[in-house]
């Protein structure tokens, strides 16, 4: 075979290969152009992404988290020894004072009891209109001295909903015992359930020995109680209107009395009888219900060792804040209630006048990125945060609305991916500013790993990029 023939054959082969390459490049360019969304993650990929975010951005996935920016130290006059204030929409801690001091929760313990009960209702194991048997351990006459009571007695007919009302409004220790024995048969077994709730939420200082809050051996901190309350409100928001915001409760009524009993006045000066027949109306122990704008929960607590405690929440214009104050001062209940009113008002009014919620949902979502020189044609970059509400400080404008209108959101991310992509690679960010002040910078990370393509695909993709 002569030299010219070899050259012609070689040229033909090269031309054919070049034509094939051009055709491949054209087809790939067309495919990439029309590729507008990434393939859904499979279960393993979803698990890997979740694991990565939890490991590398763990603070963003805690129940409570610090502000993403600094503010001047607030000049608040909080009387309680320990306190915390959070935005329930995102768990942001707006204010704290000795929030990690371990203190008995007293009757705030009952919130954990209510949580366990609500979980049983949600699971279909109990219903609100269900009649609950009252063991002797739950009768008012068998409660420890100075217990708060809803006045349960032998033979009474009481529904689950009435017990929850008695627990939340009257802070009835007898109601706490009745619920514990109904659900688990013994106080010890019910307390195990409560402690498991605390453990599941990562509350390391929260521990219970009984369900009413009477014992000083029950322990928690303001921070951990706030974290629990946030979860409680997220999972059972109806409990606020159904129980915690109700201003008064009368028990027992005619329909609650034991067979043969009739409504009649009684003298309790010598102790409580087994059969209680006198209706007693009690007001909600929370002194800010119906007093401070927006307040609709949650729970007071007092024993000598704890001082005057209060878990408080209020909602105005769609924004909800929650405070926990513990070891409040007071030589008597009147002084203790005055302290609760003072601290609750101080914290809530400061929160509503100093912050507002800004919804970032229209920005905090996955963004599609085309991939060149990779095994797949694209992937998503996702925000490394779970919350879509930002607590915004009031720093500019004559009104909070004007303040919010000055927020600017900047999206900054790569145009295209190239070659190997690793799960979690930072590919950009979302920057939220107010009046030139950065409030939050959210990393945008790759939601999956992609292998690098072979040399021919890389060459084709390089040409496609050059011609864009």
Question: Where are each of the predicted segments found?
Answer:
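N-terminal Sec-pathway targeting helices
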Residues: 1-18
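Active-site-adjacent loops and short helices of periplasmic peptidoglycan-processing enzymes
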Residues: 3, 29-235
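General helical structural elements
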Residues: 7-12, 32, 37, 303
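Intrinsic disorder/low-complexity segments
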Residues: 12, 81, 199, 259, ...
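Hydrophobic alpha-helical segments and their boundary regions
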Residues: 12-15, 80, 102, 144, ...
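Hydrophobic alpha-helical membrane-insertion segments, chiefly the h-region
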Residues: 17-28
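Domain-terminus/edge residues, biased toward the C-terminal soluble/receptor-binding domains
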Residues: 29, 203-204, 216-220, 224-468
């Amino acid at each position: 075979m002569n030299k010219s023939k070899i050259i012609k054959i070689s040229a033909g082969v090269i031309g054919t290969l070049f034509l094939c390459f051009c055709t491949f490049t054209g087809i790939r360019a067309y495919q990439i152009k029309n590729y507008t969304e990434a393939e859904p993650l499979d279960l393993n990929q979803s698990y890997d992404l979740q694991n990565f975010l939890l490991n590398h951005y763990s603070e963003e996935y805690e129940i409570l988290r610090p502000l993403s920016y600094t503010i001047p130290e607030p000049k608040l006059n909080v009387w309680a020894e320990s306190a915390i204030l959070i935005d329930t929409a995102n768990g942001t801690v707006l204010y704290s004072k000795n929030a990690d001091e371990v203190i008995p929760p007293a009757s705030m313990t009952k919130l954990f009891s209510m949580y366990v009960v609500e979980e049983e209702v949600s699971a279909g194991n109990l219903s609100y209109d269900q009649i609950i048997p009252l063991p002797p351990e739950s009768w008012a006459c068998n409660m420890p001295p100075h217990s708060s009571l809803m006045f349960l007695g032998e033979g009474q007919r009481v529904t689950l909903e009435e017990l929850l009302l008695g627990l939340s409004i009257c802070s009835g220790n007898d109601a706490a015992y009745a619920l514990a024995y109904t659900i688990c048969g013994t106080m010890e077994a019910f307390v195990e359930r409560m402690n498991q709730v605390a453990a599941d939420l990562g509350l390391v200082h929260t521990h219970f020995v009984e369900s009413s809050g009477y014992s000083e051996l029950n322990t928690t901190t303001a921070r951990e109680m706030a974290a629990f309350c946030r979860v409680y409100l997220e999972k059972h928001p109806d409990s606020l209107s159904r129980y915690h915001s109700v201003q008064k409760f009368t028990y027992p009524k005619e329909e609650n009395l034991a067979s043969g009993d009739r409504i009649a006045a009684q003298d309790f000066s010598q102790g409580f009888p087994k059969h209680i027949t006198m209706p007693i109306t009690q007001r909600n122990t929370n002194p800010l219900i119906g007093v401070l704008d927006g307040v609709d929960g949650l729970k007071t607590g007092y024993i000598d060792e704890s001082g005057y405690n209060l878990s408080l929440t209020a909602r105005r214009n769609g924004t909800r804040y929650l405070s926990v104050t513990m070891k409040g001062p007071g030589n008597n209940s009147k002084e203790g209630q005055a302290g609760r009113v003072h601290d609750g008002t101080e914290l809530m009014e400061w929160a509503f006048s100093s912050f507002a919620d800004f919804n970032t949902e229209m920005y905090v979502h996955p963004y599609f990125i085309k991939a060149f020189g990779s095994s797949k044609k694209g992937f998503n970059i996702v925000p490394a945060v779970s919350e879509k509400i930002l607590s915004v400080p009031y720093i500019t404008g004559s009104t909070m609305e004007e303040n919010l209108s000055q927020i600017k959101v900047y999206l900054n991310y790569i145009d295209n991916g190239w070659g190997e992509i690793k799960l979690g690679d930072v590919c950009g960010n979302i920057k939220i500013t107010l009046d030139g002040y950065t409030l939050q910078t959210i990393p945008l990370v790759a939601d999956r790993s992609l292998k690098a393509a072979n040399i021919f695909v890389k060459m084709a993709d390089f040409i496609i990029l050059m011609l864009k």
